[in-house]
């Protein structure tokens, strides 16, 4: 198994921001460290109460420190609307091993999905092919149940625009010619802006696949919304790869398990990776559920299940 240490500067920066001691000693920890946090706009972004922001997250480094601190406390991090993402790495490679947890599940991502509330995150993996310990090689999507379906838009993109005043919706436009907005929900989340404070430009574009939404108003009057689940292959999703009969009615932290063998290249062919070093999760649907706001993948943590074995 290939091993590596994280760049010293990055680790020291994380230590300074989190107030916790960080070591560059390789430990084979089953849990991950955050390398990048670029959410789409959303109701929990910049939010001081349930979102846990402090108002000082005005640089990418501070945003990473925020996300890492949350995950160390086993607390969720929101990826915002469609396309928002987080990148993590381990202090060791994760093997594509058939002896992983319960028949070959190599890692897990913890979310808080329950029956009727899935906000699926598309998962990607990367090998540190050039050996520089940075996530700058090729990403491979882990195919899920919706991969290859006609209703899945594989090459999707959305540009988000910074609001020009406080308390405004965040406008967006996609590459299909559709315009929309992330609704400002003042009665629930009244921070001045849902546009990430550490994004320095007045607009930014996110890219990736987009799943067909399964969000609908079950009540017919806007009072009860359902975010339907997908069969398997997505973070923060109530699929069969939870490997649990627990319905998670309390919306607690719950793992979804993944196999590296599901990685595909840009042509949709098996990538046949022997190991991975980095994982990225990206909100996979562009939808909103009335007063509940935008669909946004939430993640609590990432675990090497070859080591952890479901514990």
Each model region followed by its residue ranges:
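A domain-level signal for the mature, folded cores of soluble proteins
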Residues: 20-119, 143-311
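Acidic, glycine-anchored loop motifs typical of Ca2+
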Residues: 102, 129-138, 241
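Predominantly extracellular/luminal cell-surface or secreted proteins
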Residues: 124-128
């Amino acid at each position: 198994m290939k091993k590596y240490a994280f760049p010293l500067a990055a680790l020291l920066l994380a230590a300074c921001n989190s107030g916790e001691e960080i070591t560059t000693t390789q430990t084979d920890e089953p849990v991950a460290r955050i390398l990048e946090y670029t959410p789409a706009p959303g109701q929990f972004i910049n939010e001081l109460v349930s979102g846990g922001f402090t108002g000082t997250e005005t640089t990418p480094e501070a945003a990473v420190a925020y996300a890492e601190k949350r995950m160390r406390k086993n607390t969720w991090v929101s990826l915002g609307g469609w396309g928002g993402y987080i990148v993590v790495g381990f202090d060791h490679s994760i093997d594509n091993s058939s002896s992983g947890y319960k028949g070959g599940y190599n890692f897990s991502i913890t979310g808080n999905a329950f029956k009727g509330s899935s906000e699926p995150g598309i998962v990607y993996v990367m090998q540190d092919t050039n050996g520089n310990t940075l996530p700058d090689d090729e990403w491979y999507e882990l195919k899920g149940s919706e991969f290859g379906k006609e209703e899945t838009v594989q090459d999707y993109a959305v540009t988000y625009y910074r609001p020009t005043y406080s308390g405004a919706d965040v406008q967006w436009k996609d590459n299909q010619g559709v315009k929309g907005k992330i609704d400002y929900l003042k009665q629930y989340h009244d921070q001045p802006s849902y546009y990430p404070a550490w994004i320095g430009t007045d607009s930014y574009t996110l890219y990736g696949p987009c799943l067909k939404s399964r969000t609908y108003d079950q009540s017919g009057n806007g009072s009860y919304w359902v975010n339907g689940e997908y069969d398997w292959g997505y973070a923060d999703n109530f699929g069969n790869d939870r490997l649990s009969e627990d319905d998670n009615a309390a919306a607690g932290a719950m793992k979804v398990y993944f196999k590296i063998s599901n990685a595909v290249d840009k042509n949709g062919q098996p990538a046949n990776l022997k190991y991975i070093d980095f994982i990225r999760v990206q909100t996979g649907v562009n939808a909103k559920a009335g007063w509940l706001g935008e669909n946004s993948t939430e993640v609590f943590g990432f675990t090497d299940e070859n080591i952890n074995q479901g514990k």
